[in-house]
Amino acid sequence: MRVLIKNGIVVNADGQAKQDLLIESGIVRQLGTDISPQLPCEEIDASGCYVFPGGVDVHTHFNIDVGIARSCDDFFTGTRAAACGGTTTIIDHMGFGPNGCRLRHQLEVYRGYAAHKAVIDYSFHGVIQHINHAILDEIPMMVEEGLSSFKLYLTYQYKLNDDEVLQALRRLHESGALTTVHPENDAAIASKRAEFIAAGLTAPRYHALSRPLECEAEAIARMINLAQIAGNAPLYIVHLSNGLGLDYLRLARANHQPVWVETCPQYLLLDERSYDTEDGMKFILSPPLRNVREQDKLWCGISDGAIDVVATDHCTFSMAQRLQISKGDFSRCPNGLPGVENRMQLLFSSGVMTGRISLERFVELTSAMPARLFGLWPQKGILAPGSDGDVVIIDPRQSQQIQHRHLHDNADYSPWEGFTCQGAIVRTLSRGETIFCDGTFTGKAGRGRFLRRKPFVPPVL
């Protein structure tokens, strides 16, 4: 199969040029002006459009069981939505397994979830829900098998204490793995939540009030210090929602610590006023939405390079699930928002088209840096000879209003309903195969491949 994309502006993290792009057998073979292939091929005219590397979303939760509910997107509907939004690779955060289970247990479960369903290429982050000698011994074997990042939680049922965190950080560092962490102070949250529940204050706005930004920022600072104690272990903070936590990360970098951070579109574009609407339960997620001042601080980090990655934390529970389970009580509502289909378009519209970020920075945030950090570079995250032919074509001239009835996930609502975006995703190619074109999904379940990722190496830019 040969595909020639002509007349577009090809953009990588290190530059852009108007040139053609030739893909053969799923691999980029040539970039240049006026490419004339000697053999027949499909031609795609990208005149007036940008040709980007396919998006790499390193934070999704498909088919996750959170105890009170299972998310309504599985690895078909979730990756279908990703494909229609210009994302061609996902790394899914595996959910907790049975109490006392080995790391391999969840990997086998999740590979079963994704096989025969995933539309795009995929990998997983391991999850460390308890620490013992068997778990620590298992980590290097998992890295050898292509799982080079693992997640720790400082909140929820399987939160780790400081001693367990230190043990995990040391072994992951020694094994060539990157530690990712959900940082919130669980004890402080539990105290605040109990106060509100005792007072009968269970409306959605009290979800945000029970998880103030200081709970997140304190946990970020603690993880930074523990990583330093653990031998300057590399650390990746997921779903940052506030500026104070970003300040701590800036300080750590000034002290030459290997720390990286992601944020998500919801923290850049939605705010805590959503909790006071009639549909406030739609916006329950953790960390919660913050105020506009915190948004502005995050946008500064996006613009000046302090934030490395924009992912989604896509974790979809339908409004029907939320209402049935919660009965209007925030503390009983399953947490998470949909968004894997909207990430690329939202950041392009609100970042590039407003002048906040360059085209190159857009690529860095959405594909290049995620691929570098998580062992996929240069197979993913770049359009260059030898890389996978993963492409998203965006037409900046088109304006679109987001409406859930046009989306491809399995939810019954979108938090982005009514958002108007400048710039439209017109085509997505995965390894040279068109899987989305002009509003129509054309991929097939099961075509996605499991990606064995390389051990962690700090990116050199």
From Swiss-Prot:
- Tree of life domain: Bacteria
A single GO cellular-component term from the record reads: cytosol
**Residues involved in a divalent metal cation 2 binding:** K151, H182, H239
| Residues reported to bind a divalent metal cation 1 | H59, H61, K151, D313
Cell wall biogenesis/degradation is among the record's keywords? no
Enumerate the cofactors the protein uses.
a divalent metal cation
Modification after translation, per record: Carboxylation allows a single lysine to coordinate two divalent metal cations.
Q: Summarize where substrate binds, as residue positions.
A: Y156, S286, N335
Task: Note how many cofactor molecules are bound and how.
Answer: Binds 2 divalent metal cations per subunit.
Modification sites for N6-carboxylysine: K151
| A GO MF label | metal ion binding
According to its UniProt record, this protein's enzyme class is: hydrolase
Question: Which GO biological process categories is it annotated with?
Answer: pyrimidine nucleobase catabolic process
Q: Which InterPro entries match?
A: Amidohydro-rel, D_phenylhydantoinase, Hydantoinase/dihydroPyrase, Metal-dep_hydrolase_composite, Metal_Hydrolase, Metallo-dep_Hydrolases_sf
Q: Which reaction does it catalyse?
A: D-5-phenylhydantoin + H2O = N-carbamoyl-D-phenylglycine + H(+)
Q: How does it assemble?
A: Homotetramer.
Q: Family per UniProt?
A: Belongs to the metallo-dependent hydrolases superfamily. Hydantoinase/dihydropyrimidinase family.
Q: Return the protein name.
A: D-phenylhydantoinase
Annotated organism of origin? Escherichia coli O1:K1 / APEC
Task: Give the encoding gene's name.
Answer: hyuA
